[in-house]
Amino acid sequence: MADINQMTITDAVKDSFRERSSERFSFLLDKLIEHLHDFTRETNLTQEEWLYTLNFLYDCGQISTPERHEFILLSDVLGWSALVDMVNTKGGGTELSNLGPFYLKDAPVTPLGADIAKDREGVIVLANGIVRDTLGNPLPGAIVDTWQADGSGMYPIQDASQNAMDLRGRFSTDDEGRYYYTTVLPKSYTVPYDGPVGKLLRAGNRHAWRSKHFHYMVGAPRMRAIITEVFFEGDEYIDSDAVFGVRRSLIGKLKRVPSDANLEYDLERRPDARVDFDFVLAPAA
């Protein structure tokens, strides 16, 4: 050990973890050590830069709360979250996209046709579609979990004066695999910009805007669940989303609903517009 140098220390560190808990853990840890050491050698990382990086990570931990996970935000703006989604989009299902920091697992079970906007003003949108398998068959009883920002670009969970469960819904598809509900059109917003990740974006002369979107988590028995987003054609940030979440296949078209149009659903609130988007679930492995 006393004879290690900058070229042999990598193997020495890997060898020090002799008692591995699993083959997968061993593989991941070895690769992490290798890439971290390679980065240090390739960049000739200074001690000041090394310490700055550690302090940056410390600051990410300090500002994090159960409602705000700065490390997820860091992963998002570095494209790591998006890359993980791309690597894990398999089997012909709908492409994955960012979970984001504002998902709550206890969203209320919501009847089809409900209005999750809770009387908020703005453009009222009918969000609807069919959940299918990869053969095109509808999936009755699939669970469609959704959450979003409001018409001012805020999630209710960010505002103590609002009910954190507003603008969220958990729907079960009907016998035809359909989901449908109304909500308010969300607004583009910036990711949290007041912490270390915001400092990183400013240092890189990057904007912090997200293209407006709905979040979805969709699952069904014996199918692989998906976490994804639906974006809106023509949005200002569709080609420069701060967290690299947009995929061409996830862009929906917002269509105006005439006031005298006959709608195929029984809805709690009359919509001004609609976005039709089908989800595809692949079989579970």
Label every PLM stretch briefly.
Residues 2-285:
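Beta-strand-dominated extracellular/periplasmic modules and repeats
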